[in-house]
From Swiss-Prot:
Catalytic reaction annotation: (6R)-5,10-methylene-5,6,7,8-tetrahydrofolate + glycine + H2O = (6S)-5,6,7,8-tetrahydrofolate + L-serine
EC category: transferase
Annotated Pfam families: SHMT (PF00464)
GO cellular component: cytosol
Sample GO molecular function, one term: glycine hydroxymethyltransferase activity
Family: Belongs to the SHMT family.
Assembly: Homodimer.
UniProt keywords, alphabetically: Amino-acid biosynthesis, Cytoplasm, One-carbon metabolism, Pyridoxal phosphate, Transferase
Gene name of the encoded protein: glyA
Protein name in UniProt: Serine hydroxymethyltransferase
Localisation per UniProt entry: Cytoplasm
Residue numbers binding (6S)-5,6,7,8-tetrahydrofolate: 119, 123-125, 243
CC cofactor: pyridoxal 5'-phosphate
HAMAP family the UniProt entry points to: SHMT
Length: 413
C-alpha cells in the first residue's frame, strides 16, 4: 500500500499539487521573495536523501551511514564559501528566520540591545519586531528611512548608534528598493565596538553575482535564505568570520535545531553550483534590468514608487492618493492572474493587514525569460487593472494579456 504513485495513493493531495502547478504556469509571479527553481534543484530536493537522519556535521555525526550525505553537505559548504568569499558557512538552517535566531543565540544574551531596521520602513520581523522573538528577548532600537527620500540616512543611523550603544547592529531588509552601504554601516559598528550582522536574504543572488556590494568583508556574520534571488530551495544559511564559526555551528546544532534536512541541503548544493556558473551573473543583471523597466513603466503610467525607483530586484508602489489600498490592489491583480503582496510603505497610515502599498519583484519572471519589453507590458496590465477597475471589460482584457505573456514563456515545459 505504500509503493504507489501519489496520484493513486492520495488523489486529493495530488490534485492540489497539480492545481498549484497550473497556477504557477498561468500567473505572472511578482512576489519579490519567490522564484522558480531549476529541474536539478527539484530533483535533489525530491531525492532519497529525505530518508536520512544526520545530526551533527560532516565527519562528526551522531548517526551511522552518513558518508554520502556528508558529500552533499560538504559540497554545499564549499560552494557557498566560494560563491561569497566567506571563511565559514553553515548550510543547515531550515529557514532564514532560524538562521537569524541562531546568530542572536550565538552572540547575544537576553536583554542585550540591538539596532535594526524598522519593519514598517522595510525591515524584517526577525530584526527586532515586537511580535517576533527578536523583539521579545532583546532591547530593540530601530532606524528607518527618510520620509522625503524613502532611503536610509546613514548619518542618522550613526547618531542613533552613538547614542544607544547597541551590542549589535542589524542590516538588511525585506522591502527596501535601494542598495545598502554595508561598508558604511560596518564602520559605524566598529566605531561603537558592536557586532555587525547582515541579513542579505533578498539580495543574495545579486551579491553572489557582484551586482550589489557584498556584506561579507564588513560583517561579523551574514545570513541569507537560499531561495529568492539565489533560486535555490526554501531554506537558510549562515556565513561568518572564522572566529565565530564554532559559536555559530553550536547555535544551530545542538542549540536550536536537531537533524538537518539532507535533501534540502543537497538542493542547496545544486543551486550554489548553478550560481557559480558565468550565466548566473547575466541572469541577475536581467533581474535588475527587469525591475528597472517595470519601475519605469509604472512611473510613466502615473504611479508613485517609494524612493522613486529601484537598484535591486524589487519595487515598492505607494498607492496613497489612488483610492486603492494595498489589500485591494493585491486582490484586483490576483483576479487577473498577477500575484503580488500588499505591503506597508514607510509612514503608512493604514493597518498592516490593509496597507497603502504593494511590493513587486522580478526574480521569478526573469527565470521564466521575461525581458524589459515584457516588463513594460506588465506595467501596462497593472495600470489597466488598478486604474480602470470599474470598467467591466478590464478583467477580461487584462487576463488575456497575462495569458499571452505566460504562454510565451512556459514554466517547466
Amino acid at each position: 500500500m505504500f509503493n504507489g504513485k501519489l496520484a493513486q495513493t492520495d488523489p486529493e493531495l495530488a490534485k492540489a499539487i497539480e492545481l498549484e502547478h497550473q497556477r504557477q504556469q498561468r500567473n505572472i509571479e511578482l512576489i519579490a521573495s519567490e522564484n522558480f527553481v531549476s529541474p536539478a534543484v527539484l530533483e535533489a530536493q525530491g531525492s532519497i536523501l529525505t530518508n536520512k537522519y544526520a545530526e551533527g556535521y560532516p565527519g562528526k555525526r551522531y548517526y551511522g551511514g552518513c558518508e554520502f550525505v556528508d558529500i552533499a553537505e560538504s559540497l554545499a559548504i564549499s560552494r557557498a564559501k566560494k560563491l561569497f568569499g566567506a571563511d565559514h558557512a553553515n548550510v543547515q538552517p531550515h529557514s532564514g528566520a532560524q538562521a537569524n535566531f541562531a546568530v542572536y543565540f550565538a552572540l547575544l544574551q537576553p536583554g542585550d540591545k540591538i539596532l535594526g531596521m524598522n519593519l514598517a520602513h522595510g525591515g524584517h520581523l526577525t530584526h527586532g519586531s515586537p511580535v517576533n522573538v527578536s523583539g521579545k528577548y532583546f532591547n530593540v532600537v530601530a532606524y528607518g528611512v527618510e520620509e522625503d527620500t524613502g532611503c536610509i540616512n546613514y548619518e542618522k543611523l550613526r547618531e542613533i548608534a552613538l547614542q544607544e550603544k547597541p551590542k549589535m547592529i542589524v542590516a538588511g531588509a525585506s522591502a527596501y528598493a535601494r542598495a545598502i552601504d554595508f561598508k558604511k554601516i560596518g564602520e559605524i559598528a566598529k566605531e561603537i565596538d558592536a557586532y555587525f550582522f547582515v541579513d542579505m536574504a533578498h539580495i543574495a543572488g545579486l551579491v553572489a553575482a557582484g551586482l550589489h556590494q557584498s556584506p561579507v568583508p564588513y560583517a561579523d556574520v551574514v545570513t541569507t535564505t537560499t531561495h529568492k534571488t539565489l533560486r535555490g530551495p526554501r531554506g537558510g544559511m549562515i556565513l561568518c568570520k572564522e572566529e565565530y564559526a564554532q559559536l555559530i555551528d553550536k547555535a544551530i546544532f545542538p542549540g536550536s535545531q536537531g537533524g538537518p534536512l539532507m535533501h534540502v541541503i543537497a538542493a542547496k548544493a545544486a543551486a550554489f553550483g548553478e550560481a557559480l556558473k558565468p550565466e548566473f551573473k547575466a541572469y541577475q543583471q536581467q533581474i535588475i534590468n527587469n525591475a528597472q523597466a517595470l519601475a519605469k513603466g509604472l512611473l510613466e503610467r502615473g504611479f508613485n514608487l517609494v524612493s522613486g525607483g529601484t537598484d535591486n530586484h524589487l519595487i515598492l508602489v505607494d498607492l496613497r492618493g489612488t483610492g486603492i489600498t494595498g489589500k485591494q490592489a493585491e486582490t484586483l491583480l490576483d483576479e487577473v492572474h498577477i500575484t503580488c503582496n500588499k505591503n506597508a510603505i514607510p509612514f503608512d497610515p493604514e493597518k498592516p493587514f490593509v496597507t497603502s502599498g504593494i511590493r513587486l519583484g522580478t526574480p521569478a519572471v526573469t527565470t521564466r525569460g521575461f525581458k524589459e519589453k515584457d516588463m513594460d507590458k506588465v506595467a501596462e496590465i497593472i495600470a489597466l487593472t488598478l486604474q480602470e477597475k470599474d470598467n467591466p471589460d478590464t478583467q477580461e482584457k487584462a487576463r488575456a494579456m497575462v495569458k499571452e505573456l505566460c504562454d510565451k514563456y512556459p514554466l517547466y515545459a
